[in-house]
């Protein structure tokens, strides 16, 4: 039996048909990803609702092979792999039913400080919106200098939020809709690198994952779940920012 919680957590995300909610329920019920696999055959007796299809899904050697490759990337690039059992995992996010059971992080920050907010908005930011970001973040730097500011590194409001935070020496984290083997959009790479000293880049996605449309919706639940409040600066009536706020 493998006793690496990180490896087992990654493998669990790759087991077909388990999903975010199912994976978290298994870990919450049994205690760890290691124990989910170690007690696979006894799960129906230990956890109500676990049936033979779940047992079959957990018998997935390919998931462990892929997880091993991911851990090689993590260690080679000095990334941090956070599982639900880690004290440094975002505590607010851990309380969400669909919290990811593993996160990948590059940077330096405390996700569990007293105040964490996210600022999001349209990719077609107006001059007013850009100035609001700068002014609001500056005011925060005076009133709550230890606040962590979260956004998504996207065009428009997101990137202006990150740059405003950097300008005021505040910690800022971008939650990404792809793996840490790339930066999207690439034009924001310099800002992303600048964030690593006091903030960083966070994702639930494995390397090789493209920034596909549905990944942004999944990403938004992390942005909202790890924060105390969501501030929508500008948004279309059906924009992704309002999905985050909801």
Residue ranges of predicted features:
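Glycine-biased, small-residue-rich flexible motifs in mid-sequence functional cores and linkers
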Residues: 1-3, 83-246
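Short, positively charged patches
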Residues: 1-139
